Amino acid sequence: MVNLSIIISSSEVNGPGGLFDINATLPLVAIQFLLLMVLLNVILYSPLLTIIEERKEYILNKLAKASEILSQANELTAQYEQELNTVRKEAQLEITNSQKIHKEILEIELNISQKYIDNLLENITDDLLEKKNTALNSLDTIVQSLCVQIENRLSI
């Protein structure tokens, strides 16, 4: 490479003719630049641009699908939350109804037990009063018979 540059710098243009005589260097470099630009555009940039465009479309499609899936997930979440709230309300109503029913059953059983105890107590009280009256009557007859016997003995 160094040798080539030395040769070019040491060479002299002798005489007329050649490219450098008409000063066409600048247009030639411009034509070379344009040809190289067209060649690079056809060979390198066009395939790169198509690949980039395909990748852009692929990403946009994936983003659209992802946003669609996200919106569906949000809809399902809202639907399930609403269903969960209604089920919770129904369960709460069921619990309160069951508590009311159990409370009523307990009150009924308590009333039945209270009536049974009241009846039993009344029966026992009546029975005791009857036994007391019977005992007092029998004691009264015994006392009267003893009084009669005492009088009989005293009168003798």
From Swiss-Prot:
Subcellular localization(s) per the UniProt record: Plastid, Chloroplast thylakoid membrane
Membrane disposition: Single-pass membrane protein
Gene Ontology CC entries for this record: chloroplast thylakoid membrane; proton-transporting ATP synthase complex
Major site of localization recorded for this protein: plastid
Keywords: ATP synthesis, ATP-binding, CF(0), Chloroplast, Hydrogen ion transport, Ion transport, Membrane, Nucleotide-binding, Plastid, Thylakoid, Transmembrane, Transmembrane helix, Transport
Domain of life: Eukaryota
Statement: the UniProt record of this protein carries the keyword Membrane: yes
An MF annotation (GO) of this entry: proton-transporting ATPase activity, rotational mechanism
Residue intervals passing through the bilayer: 24-44
Extra information: In plastids the F-type ATPase is also known as CF(1)CF(0).
Function: F(1)F(0) ATP synthase produces ATP from ADP in the presence of a proton or sodium gradient. F-type ATPases consist of two structural domains, F(1) containing the extramembraneous catalytic core and F(0) containing the membrane proton channel, linked together by a central stalk and a peripheral stalk. During catalysis, ATP synthesis in the catalytic domain of F(1) is coupled via a rotary mechanism of the central stalk subunits to proton translocation.
Subunit annotation: F-type ATPases have 2 components, F(1) - the catalytic core - and F(0) - the membrane proton channel. F(1) has five subunits: alpha(3), beta(3), gamma(1), delta(1), epsilon(1). F(0) has four main subunits: a(1), b(1), b'(1) and c(10-14). The alpha and beta chains form an alternating ring which encloses part of the gamma chain. F(1) is attached to F(0) by a central stalk formed by the gamma and epsilon chains, while a peripheral stalk is formed by the delta, b and b' chains.
Family statement: Belongs to the ATPase B chain family.
Name recorded for this polypeptide: ATP synthase subunit b', chloroplastic
Organism for this UniProt entry: Trieres chinensis (Marine centric diatom)
